[in-house]
Amino acid sequence: MAEAASCARKGTKYAEGTQPFTVLIEGNIGSGKTTYLNHFEKYKNDICLLTEPVEKWRNVNGVNLLELMYKDPKKWAMPFQSYVTLTMLQSHTAPTNKKLKIMERSIFSARYCFVENMRRNGSLEQGMYNTLEEWYKFIEESIHVQADLIIYLRTSPEVAYERIRQRARSEESCVPLKYLQELHELHEDWLIHQRRPQSCKVLVLDADLNLENIGTEYQRSESSIFDAISSNQQPSPVLVSPSKRQRVAR
């Protein structure tokens, strides 16, 4: 982080000007982020695709931090979120010669959704939360995190819960519906109600749809991304699937 601090003193940010047009894929656990990312595999020669670094969280020199966090959040929430911050920052600043980078989640959702939820439910003591906030402030001031468009895979907690049950990841076996409901509200506050700072536009997709019917939503977002790149402009502020418009209006 010394290089980042040096850049900050010079009035520039570390990694500034090094990243292409960057799209962040956001949504609850079980919202279909990895499936969405797989949709762009056909463009892998032109796009830098970065999945959420879950495998790193599962193996920190032989330690499964993700599993430990779910089993004993009071003890492991702080080290887990510290490592999440590091690994997400590595993805944000990873060099690429591609014209487009698409990332599964970001340092923003870690801060505004997961860390905030841990503070609210008591998994993070106030001192722990304050420490993480200081890290986020340092990153915000010193390191450039490219974000041109957020794709929000908007999913009801009940649908997300059923998908989690079906995929049966061992670490997620203890995830209750209430936890997904809490995360859903935090995503809504951030991406729909805009109660958190936003540096880019948001495209909202109806991710409750099953695989047979969600292709239209994928195609809509794909067109929006490539149109924005070709015109060097960002899409309209909040583009919402027709089936979701009434919910956003409330």
Swiss-Prot record:
EC number, as in UniProt: 2.7.1.145
Regulation: Subject to feedback inhibition by dTTP.
Reaction(s) catalysed (UniProt annotation): a 2'-deoxyribonucleoside + ATP = a 2'-deoxyribonucleoside 5'-phosphate + ADP + H(+)
GO biological process: DNA biosynthetic process; nucleoside phosphate biosynthetic process; nucleoside salvage
GO molecular function: ATP binding; cytidine kinase activity; deoxyadenosine kinase activity; deoxycytidine kinase activity; deoxyguanosine kinase activity; deoxynucleoside kinase activity; kinase activity; thymidine kinase activity
Annotated catalytic residues: 104
Residues that hold substrate according to the record: 52, 70, 81, 105, 172
Family: Belongs to the DCK/DGK family.
Protein name, per record: Deoxynucleoside kinase
Gene from which this protein is expressed: dnk
